[in-house]
């Protein structure tokens, strides 16, 4: 079966869509860490049979060691779940995704890959950004070839012929991995104990939809959330100036309405896509994330309970070793959290 892990700070409607879309796209069970105190979101996720939720906004999960940066919190949380799933027979793959992402894959082909294929790479498809918050999220940009990028530059669509300029979000995609103690989940790609990036199997049927700032309103909401969740997030070089500008603007202590208006100006100048030109060139892919291709398969209730009880016990641990190992230290933490190995839920190690 397929599992996912996410660290989330989003509205209830956004979380509802995030869960529904990923469960309809091949994920069987989702583990969601709530990065802010949101009683309505917590209630919804707690009641969902295909979701395990962790309240991770304060000392109940982190003790006195809550990382300042969102990326670090995501990294810790993903690797806790990865480690716990090395003891779970039901979880064949784990995908680390954000709340604005949807896996886009062929589940049948994925499950036919040989056992020695331990990592898969999901190429990004980025939702076009237009000033229409009600537009259906069905038009996506793919990564372009060098020649296609030169054409876009010549047409004045981008200032520089690079996918890093063309995409507003990440170009690195995401990854899925078979849970193992010597592989560590990253934000985009897994690493080994030496923190070296590990290669993954790629195919046209492996992708991730990124609903990155699909509209002016979404752009304003996203950056307000990100920049009130800790230090300025790490971004690729092509976006550094824009993020610096947004961070500076938010910290000027201007009236909220004025800040939102100026954020909207930044959106118009730097983010809004020339959808008409991209459409005429045939550069857009059509995907409907709400057209469920799969129904989530049910993980046995006893296995879900084991996972959730283990997560509760991990809350009291020092989680540093989960991020980068070594494996024997992670093994000891697992023994402390879930007990020593026994058949069934605790019967596997890779």
Where do the model's predicted regions map?
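Short beta-strand/loop segment that forms part of the nucleotide-sugar
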Residues: 28-37, 54-57
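Short acidic/polar active-site loop segments enriched in Thr and Asp
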Residues: 28-29, 92, 118
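Long, low-complexity, intrinsically disordered segments
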Residues: 340-350
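Acidic-and-aromatic substrate-binding clefts and catalytic sites of carbohydrate-active enzymes
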Residues: 9, 33-38, 103
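Short beta-strand-to-loop acidic/aromatic patch adjacent to the donor-nucleotide binding site
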Residues: 90-104
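N-proximal low-complexity "stem/linker" segments adjacent to membrane-targeting elements
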Residues: 1-23
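Catalytic-site signature of metal-activated, phosphate-bearing donor transferases
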Residues: 71, 105-331, 335
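Active-site-proximal specificity loops/subdomain of glycosyltransferases
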Residues: 40-93
């Amino acid at each position: 079966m397929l599992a996912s892990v996410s660290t989330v700070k989003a509205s209830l409607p956004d979380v509802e869509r995030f869960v529904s879309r990923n469960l309809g796209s091949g994920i069987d069970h989702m583990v969601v860490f709530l990065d802010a105190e949101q009683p309505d979101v917590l209630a919804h996720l707690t009641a969902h049979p295909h979701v395990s939720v962790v309240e991770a906004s304060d000392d109940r999960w982190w003790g006195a060691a809550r990382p300042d940066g969102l990326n670090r919190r995501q990294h810790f949380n993903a690797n806790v779940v990865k480690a716990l799933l090395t003891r779970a027979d039901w979880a064949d793959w784990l995908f680390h995704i954000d709340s604005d992402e949807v896996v886009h894959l062929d589940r049948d082909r994925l499950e036919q890959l040989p056992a020695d294929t331990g990592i898969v790479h999901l190429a990004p498809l980025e939702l076009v950004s237009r000033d229409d918050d009600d537009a259906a999220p069905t038009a996506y940009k793919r990564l372009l070839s060098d020649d296609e990028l030169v054409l876009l530059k010549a047409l004045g669509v981008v200032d520089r012929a690079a996918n890093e300029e063309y995409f507003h979000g990440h170009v690195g995609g995401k990854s899925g991995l078979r849970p193992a103690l010597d592989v560590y989940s990253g934000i985009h790609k897994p690493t080994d104990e030496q923190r070296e990036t590990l290669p993954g199997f790629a195919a046209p049927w492996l992708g991730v939809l990124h609903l990155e700032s699909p509209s002016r309103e979404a752009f304003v909401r996203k950056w307000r959330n990100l920049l009130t969740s800790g230090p300025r997030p790490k971004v690729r070089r092509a976006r550094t100036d824009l993020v610096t500008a947004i961070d500076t603007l938010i910290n000027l202590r201007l009236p909220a309405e004025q800040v939102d208006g100026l954020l909207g100006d930044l959106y118009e100048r730097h983010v809004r896509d020339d959808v008409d030109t991209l459409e005429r060139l045939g550069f857009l892919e059509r995907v409907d994330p709400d057209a469920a291709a799969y129904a989530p398969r049910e993980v046995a209730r006893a296995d879900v309970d084991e996972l959730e009880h283990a997560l509760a016990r991990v809350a009291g641990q020092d989680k540093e070793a989960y991020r980068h190992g070594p494996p024997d230290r992670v093994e000891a933490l697992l023994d402390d959290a879930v007990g020593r190995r026994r058949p069934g839920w605790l019967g596997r190690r890779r």
